[in-house]
Amino acid sequence: MNRALHEKPELTNARADFYGRMAEQSMTPLWEVLHTLLSDAPVTDATPHKWDYDLCRPYIMESADVISAAEAERRVMVLENPTLEGRSCITEALYAGLQLIMPGEVAPAHRHSPAALRFIVEGSGAYTAINGEKAYMEVGDLILTPSWVWHDHGHDGDVPVVWLDGLDIPLVRHLGPVFAEPYPEAEFPKGRPTGDNVARYGGNMLPFGDTYSSQNSPVFHYPYTQTRETLETLAKSGDTDPRHGIKLEYINPTTGGPVMPTIATYMQMLPKEFSGDAYQTTAAWVYHCVEGSGQTIINGDTIEWKAKDTFVVPAWYKHEHRTNGDSFLFSFTDQPVQKKLGLFREAA
């Protein structure tokens, strides 16, 4: 015998009276709300959406005339999911935004408990300094600012630089442990030389006697030139996944796991005229097109994308990628949290 999930019981006068008296002790009846708390499949308030960079860019550039990086702390245009209006998030657990820094500017040093990533969209010559070590930006680079590390941004070049921010702020706010602290000066004191993090931990070797132990990757700069070369080399084998093309995860080299405990990051190469099988998971995915163009069909609706566009696939939405030519998609997801809690699922 099949049994349906709980439905809301009939509200009688006697029950309404009982509920009113119960409320005086800050109690409510579970059976009145159980149907909203449990469901036969994940329910999300987020909706699929694309941010066309050509339409967003004029506002990004105009923001430089409206407010300085120093006054804004971080001059970011939040990519707010249209069905999560006012909540400053792209999904219930993830935040995304497009940040601008102009030549000569400094976005002052601070640190916070939410973890963050920067994926470079446009320009070069700017940098992020992590505990004083500078990572210079090129389009397609991934730069991490993990939880509670000092970081500031600056610009030694001569063209505007824009990057995609990805953070776990909504998740951390929901759980409660949000902390933030400004550094007393605009810039953190000079640290290790540029490239030290990659040399120390990114060459498939570890320094002798190293005792590094953290869920955050000690490598915080993943250059796109290396990522792209790796994907192109793998493409020569012809071993293409029917759902993902050729997809690689950026990892913490000391653990083999995700770069940060709450956010996993990926880059995938989808060959010309790729038509992928559907993929469905309990995690939400934020995609950004680095090169190429194509379409993603999300629960039957098609999103057209091209280089520099960003789009979101909420939890438990089926999606399948199709391409016009060779395309490269960066993505980040809340998958690691669900895996650690034993909640992550993929549809067969």
Show the residue positions of the predicted features.
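A short beta-strand-loop-beta hairpin characteristic of the jelly-roll/cupin
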Residues: M102-V139, T145-V149, G154, Y279-A307
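C-terminal structured domain segments across diverse proteins
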Residues: T254-G257, I263, M267-M269, T282, ...
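Conserved metal-binding segment of the jelly-roll/cupin
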Residues: I130, Y136-G157, W163-D168, I298, ...
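A short beta-loop-beta micro-motif enriched in histidine and acidic residues
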Residues: L84-Y95, M102-L117, G132, T255-A264, ...
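A short, N-terminal "cap"/entry segment at the start of jelly-roll beta-barrel domains
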Residues: M1-T91, F188-T262, Y266
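Hydrophobic alpha-helix feature that most strongly marks membrane-spanning transmembrane helices
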Residues: S275, H288-G294, W316, D334-V337
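Double-stranded beta-helix
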Residues: N2-R15, D156-N216, F220, T323-A348
